[in-house]
Regions:
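Broad, structure-driven detector of short, well-ordered beta-strand segments within folded domains
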Residues: 52-57, 62, 103-110, 187-191
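Forkhead-associated
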Residues: 41-89
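Acidic/His-leaning functional-site neighborhoods
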Residues: 176-224, 233
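N-terminal cleavable signal peptides for secretion/export
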Residues: 3-51
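Phosphate/adenylate-binding glycine loop and adjacent helical scaffold
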Residues: 79-81, 85-86, 90-106, 114, ...
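Short strand-coil-strand connectors
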Residues: 48-50, 77, 101-103, 181-185, ...
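Long, compositionally biased interface segments
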Residues: 9, 17-19, 26, 221-279
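Surface-exposed beta-loop interaction hotspot
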Residues: 103-172
Length: 279
């Protein structure tokens, strides 16, 4: 007789646990719901919501410069700013940590063009206070796909539009092709490198109907046998579904499914069940 306490969790149980952890992740002090500002700095200026005067550094230097008095209570790398301090960017081997208060922190990000922005997180943001849940489809085994993975030597460059880039594209390296057939339709998808994973940005027949209109993300890793598993139950909402201060990539044409993919996350909901952000 099997002891229920020691029985192997079902796929559905594992998915439920994954979803709970996902909801916890977005309300962390630097989770997606905590981002309250992303301000690109091209000249000396103040930044909404935080003290100090911020300025770019000389070309080739990583980060920003902040000018402040002790009364501003800006702490960079554990030191209270009194005068000016260099805040190293994410592209530096040792990026700086910034604290403005017990709940508000900052971090400097970099663009491919060498521009820098201050991101500000608030562990007590309006988004965190209003958050109710991430609405999602129930586990759907029909959308666990084993696809063929074909590596492309040197990769191929694909232009991805971004939500706030007014139609311009950013070049991303796609290191291989993802191909499969489902219900008589052939697919050839483009996923770009994102850290150690591949990031698939896609839209489908549910986008703007029952799921977030911008699209969704799926993070992947090729298998040693030349296949790649697409478990769309793990499809997540992009960060811009949680905060308007993110600029998310949009699905290229080849990643736009005409059919509905009724698996994965749908929308971010407030405590009262309404959408957190009107799209």
């Amino acid at each position: 007789m099997t002891d229920a306490a020691t029985s192997t969790p079902t796929v559905e149980d594992a998915y439920a646990t994954y979803h709970e952890r996902r909801e916890l992740s977005v309300v962390q002090p630097k989770g997606s719901l905590a981002l309250v500002n992303t301000q690109w700095i091209d000249s000396e200026q103040t930044i909404w919501g935080v003290p100090g005067v911020w300025a770019p550094l000389s070309d080739g230097e990583s980060g920003l410069r902040v000018m402040a008095t002790p009364a501003d209570n800006i702490v960079v790398d554990g030191v209270l700013v009194d005068g000016s301090a260099v805040v190293r960017g994410k592209d530096d081997p040792n990026p700086s940590e910034i604290s403005f208060s017990d709940t508000v922190t900052g971090f400097v990000i970099a663009s491919e063009a060498g521009a820098y922005a201050l991101r500000v997180w608030d562990a007590n943001s309006e988004g965190i206070r209003e958050f109710g849940s991430i609405d999602a489809f129930g586990y759907n085994p029909d959308w666990v796909i084993t696809a063929a993975w074909t590596e492309i030597p040197g990769g191929v460059t694909v232009g991805f539009e971004h939500l706030k880039d007014d139609g311009s594209t950013r070049a991303e390296v796609v290191p291989g092709s993802i191909t499969f057939s489902k219900d008589g339709i052939e697919y050839d998808l483009a996923a770009f490198k994102s850290g150690r994973a591949l990031q698939l940005v896609f839209a489908d027949g549910t986008s703007g109907v029952s799921t977030y209109s911008v699209g969704r993300f799926l993070f992947l890793a090729p298998n040693p046998d030349g296949t790649i598993t697409l478990d769309f139950n793990r499809a997540v909402l992009p960060p811009c579904a949680f905060s308007y201060n993110f600029n998310c990539p949009l699905p290229p044409k080849q990643n736009r499914f005409s059919v509905p993919i009724e698996a994965g996350e749908k929308n971010v909901l407030k405590k009262d069940g309404t959408l957190l952000h009107e799209e």
